[in-house]
């Protein structure tokens, strides 16, 4: 005796979504455009996809979504050097990831499937092949692991034609289950099925409400991480350096983001670069220059001798110079002074130590992006003063006004940029974030034997327990 054939609709029958169906397509397109380094084109591409889908629907034609998307990308010159197969493979990985995380089993139908005895198939009006549905059902541990889609046959349930294409349904008792009164009830009945209607309950789409300051800060960090990733793709850089201190926390969260999104960026690597303004400023040393190459720093922080010495962590070694000379102009006008000569030699030696350290870690082995909390990006300026540097861009949480003569090129920020639009809260805001996002391993002040030398802040160490609790909460 032939077994009964049981067929099931997939969407809103076997599987339900936590979101609107269009959302999975929109989000997947965003990740695909990010993969291509064109995230700014996301909205335009989404509109074109929806318009083309509408055209297919009006013509009563079926399609594969990946072919439709690749066609739009080619037509709009958005492939960015990637071949069709690479983009299709990336799309399939992204879309499966999104649907896997946005769907859940319909308990009512799963119980029904478990009690049905016979051959079981899914029949879906959908724009992928059946292997995609099989993979998704397998992930959700649904026992219906074979079936067909409208895209594969070029006809749909809504028109009734898809049922006619399935030989197994002929000459057998057939029971179909679904939620759509036209496609799953009327058309299935017309094709000879007994039918079971699954009434879909309208589910309210929950909007995320921020409950506390930790969640507010978490969204800031998440947006910063996404900003870094977007910059990496735009600049075609797979190496990302996070500066010490706040960078330790930023890297931890960026790595977490990479682990929670589609695995389409396997070439991206992240490292902590032990660096600081004090450790890097000597890179600008130029003995033939009037101010030894440090005019930018002097413009920012003043011409006091003690301030100048602090640039290089040499204030204790050369404290005598603070009383001997009125300011840096006075100091550098006496270069024949043995102590001033010794100071200049100390700065030159520090430059060599910093350069040797960067060479030892192969800092310039490939194009890179650097990440820091902000202020004005002076560490980036110091690093980029080297002839053969490979830094392509600097990503910052926020940027203050650049001083006259300071470069604003290759720098961008995610929260604010006072060079474009002034925000009154920024000084307090960044200072607060600098405290909350800080690391407790001390500030790098020099390099000894190609290893960073650090200066500990005992006040920070005393508050370390509170800081760790806050960072874990974020």
Model-derived features with residue positions:
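Short glycine-rich phosphate-binding loop at a beta-alpha junction
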Residues: 7, 125, 237-244, 368-371
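Flexible inter-domain linker/hinge segments
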Residues: 167, 201-224
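Active-site neighborhood of HAD-like aspartate-dependent phosphohydrolases
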Residues: 2-48
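Long, contiguous domain-sized segments
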Residues: 213, 217, 224, 282-297, ...
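Acidic, divalent-metal-coordinating active-site segment for phosphoryl/phosphodiester hydrolysis
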Residues: 162, 180-195, 380
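Conserved Lys-Pro-Asp/Glu-containing loop-to-beta segment of HAD-superfamily phosphomonoesterases
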Residues: 157-184, 368-369
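A metal-dependent, Asp-based hydrolase signature
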Residues: 30-32, 40-94
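Substrate-recognition element of Asp-dependent hydrolases with the DxDx(T/V) motif
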Residues: 84-138, 147-151
């Amino acid at each position: 005796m032939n077994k009964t054939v049981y067929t099931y609709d997939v969407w809103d029958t076997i599987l339900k979504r936590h979101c609107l169906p269009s959302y999975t397509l929109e989000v997947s397109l965003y990740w695909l455009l990010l993969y291509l380094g064109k995230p700014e084109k996301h909205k335009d591409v989404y509109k074109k996809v929806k318009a083309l889908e509408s055209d297919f629907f009006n013509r009563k034609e079926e399609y594969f979504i990946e072919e439709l998307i690749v066609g739009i990308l080619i037509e709009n010159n958005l492939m960015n050097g990637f071949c069709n197969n690479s983009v299709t493979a990336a799309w399939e990985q992204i879309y499966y990831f999104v649907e896997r995380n946005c769907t859940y089993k319909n308990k009512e139908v799963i119980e029904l499937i478990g009690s049905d005895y016979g051959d079981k198939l899914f029949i879906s009006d959908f724009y992928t092949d059946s292997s995609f549905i099989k993979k998704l059902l397998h992930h959700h541990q649904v026992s219906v692991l074979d079936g067909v889609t409208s895209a594969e046959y070029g006809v749909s349930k809504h028109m009734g034609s898809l049922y006619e294409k399935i030989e197994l349904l002929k000459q057998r008792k057939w029971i179909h289950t679904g939620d759509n009164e036209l496609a799953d009830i009327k058309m299935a009945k017309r094709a000879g099925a007994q039918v079971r209607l699954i009434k879909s309950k309208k589910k309210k789409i929950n909007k995320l409400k921020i409950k506390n300051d930790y969640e507010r800060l978490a969204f800031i960090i998440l947006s910063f991480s996404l900003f870094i990733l977007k910059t990496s793709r735009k600049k075609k850089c797979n190496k990302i350096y996070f500066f010490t201190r706040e960078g330790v926390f930023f890297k931890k969260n960026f790595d977490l983001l990479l682990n929670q999104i589609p695995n389409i960026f396997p070439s991206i690597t992240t490292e902590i670069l032990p660096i600081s303004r004090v450790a890097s400023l000597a890179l600008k040393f130029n003995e033939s220059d009037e101010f030894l190459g440090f005019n930018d720093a002097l413009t920012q922080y003043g011409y006091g001798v003690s301030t100048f010495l602090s640039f290089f962590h040499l204030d204790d070694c050369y404290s005598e110079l603070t009383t001997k000379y009125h300011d840096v102009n006075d100091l550098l006008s006496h270069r024949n002074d043995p102590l001033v000569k010794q100071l200049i030699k100390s700065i030159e030696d520090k430059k060599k130590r910093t350069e040797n350290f960067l060479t030892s870690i192969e800092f310039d082995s490939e194009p890179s992006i650097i990440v820091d909390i902000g202020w004005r990006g002076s560490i980036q300026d110091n690093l980029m003063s080297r002839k053969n540097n490979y830094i392509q861009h600097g990503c910052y949480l926020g940027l203050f006004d650049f001083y006259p003569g300071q470069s604003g090129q290759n720098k961008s920020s995610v929260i604010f940029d006072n060079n474009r639009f002034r925000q009154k809260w920024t000084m307090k805001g960044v200072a607060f974030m600098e405290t909350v996002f800080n690391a407790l391993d001390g500030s790098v002040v020099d390099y000894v034997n190609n290893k960073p030398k650090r200066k500990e802040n005992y006040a920070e160490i005393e508050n370390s327990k509170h800081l760790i609790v806050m960072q874990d909460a974020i």
